[in-house]
């Protein structure tokens, strides 16, 4: 049985596979999903009797090579799970048309703001009007960090027509945060959409949040 708050175990496993390198100190140009394919057991956790799938994507291929080499020599994960097979997913072919994305993990948006002379963290969700601009701003910042050209047509927005959108409580490293489980629509150049699909959206993609399917 894998506990409900296993997400921090995935983070620890991926960092173990990556080893000691500068990726931990840089802005996260990678994203990864939670475990897919399990059955929930009430009050206990998840059962992966038929195995689980985990998606990991990096903008910089050198880290992918490090990850795969390490997995092959050390496939053990946690709670009795270990990697049995590594496969490569073909990159989607995007066009200039708006692209719709489902989420592999919820999108987490936060900013440090000053109110009444005091700085504090503010969190944003799919029903906050600022959220679309903040997701777009973060993605553009990551594109600049990656050395990609600016995309003035880039716009990220929550698909508010989705009926089952919700706010989800996520616990990582003992800290509880709420994030948005709601699909997104991305406008912009095909390269920008591919970049978003690779690195994820919002804050915390390096700790398993904001991964796209």
Regions found by a protein language model. Give the residues of each.
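RNA-interacting cores
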Residues: 1-213
């Amino acid at each position: 049985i894998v506990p409900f708050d296993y997400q921090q175990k995935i983070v620890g496993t991926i960092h173990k596979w990556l080893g000691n390198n500068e990726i931990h100190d840089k802005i996260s140009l990678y994203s990864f999903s939670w475990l897919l394919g399990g059955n929930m057991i009430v009050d206990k956790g998840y059962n992966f009797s038929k195995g689980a799938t985990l998606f990991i994507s990096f903008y910089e291929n050198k880290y992918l090579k490090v990850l795969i080499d390490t997995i092959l020599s050390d496939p053990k994960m946690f709670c009795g799970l270990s990697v049995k097979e590594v496969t490569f997913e073909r990159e989607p072919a995007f066009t200039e048309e708006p692209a719709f994305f489902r989420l592999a993990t919820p999108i987490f948006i936060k900013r440090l703001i000053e109110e009444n002379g005091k700085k504090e963290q503010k969190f944003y969700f799919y029903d906050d009007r600022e959220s679309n601009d903040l997701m777009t701003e973060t993605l553009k910042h990551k594109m600049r960090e990656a050395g990609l050209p600016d995309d003035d047509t880039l716009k990220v927005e929550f698909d508010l027509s989705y009926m089952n959108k919700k706010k989800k409580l996520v616990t990582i490293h003992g800290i509880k945060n709420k994030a948005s489980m709601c699909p997104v629509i991305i406008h912009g150049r095909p390269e920008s959409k591919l970049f978003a699909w690779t690195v994820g959206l919002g804050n915390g993609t390096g700790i398993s949040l904001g991964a796209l399917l």
